[in-house]
């Protein structure tokens, strides 16, 4: 082990540390960071070399953050990344600094948004917030309106998590939906992600995702938002139902097959006659 450590350059050590951090399960960033910190034993090297991993983790996980002075949380995503550690809160029309290690928002300031698409963004956000409130008690959503390749685009992100460290499990739901505002009909593209980690008497992770495509009728802002939510609700319900059914099937078949049906003697023990067995007599005489 010592020889291997001597062969690793600082760059290689940081690269390995960054991979551990990026793949930290939901709700376990601090635990992984502290373990990596002990292994690397060089705080300056870790902070300077793995800073990109802290940022990538928060972007990938749709980390929610509370901004002082504002009621609703906002998600940290690539769509709100303004560069130089600043992010956009489209609902409140502010930008703020975000510390990826401490996961804290500071210095909120007013910020310009895409006014040409703001009425569409607001309508979708209003409908999505009502949907999230109904289906995800701990959920947070952020809706962006952006011009991408010359097309006015709506991007809706949802995050919901349950962190139960005392019960040895943590989990997170993420979904991202996009559509462009074009006459008549448009294509809705979504990706749904579930990640759960269970670590009592073992180490099991569920990592699943599903890509979605559907067509959306475009009319006025409010009606289009309603039709969009119908697509989101149907797809997310179907996905969650499928995950539950697959889990039950695995419990009844795959996991059951891993358990030994009979002892190595291929004979079941009749516990009512245990004293007549040799082992029973030995236990009685012990």
Swiss-Prot record:
One of its GO terms (molecular function) is actin filament binding. Keywords: Acetylation, Actin capping, Actin-binding, Phosphoprotein. The modification Phosphoserine is found at residue 9. This is F-actin-capping protein subunit alpha-2. Belongs to the F-actin-capping protein alpha subunit family. InterPro entries: CapZ_alpha, CapZ_alpha/beta, CapZ_alpha/beta_2, CapZ_alpha_1, F-actin_cap_asu_CS. It comes from the Eukaryota. The keyword Acetylation applies. One of its GO terms (cellular component) is F-actin capping protein complex. The gene is CAPZA2. Component of the F-actin capping complex, composed of a heterodimer of an alpha and a beta subunit. Component of the WASH complex, composed of F-actin-capping protein subunit alpha (CAPZA1, CAPZA2 or CAPZA3), F-actin-capping protein subunit beta (CAPZB), WASHC1, WASHC2, WASHC3, WASHC4 and WASHC5. Interacts with RCSD1/CAPZIP. The keyword Acetylation applies. The modification N-acetylalanine is found at residue 2. F-actin-capping proteins bind in a Ca(2+)-independent manner to the fast growing ends of actin filaments (barbed end) thereby blocking the exchange of subunits at these ends. Unlike other capping proteins (such as gelsolin and severin), these proteins do not sever actin filaments. GO terms for biological process: actin cytoskeleton organization; barbed-end actin filament capping.
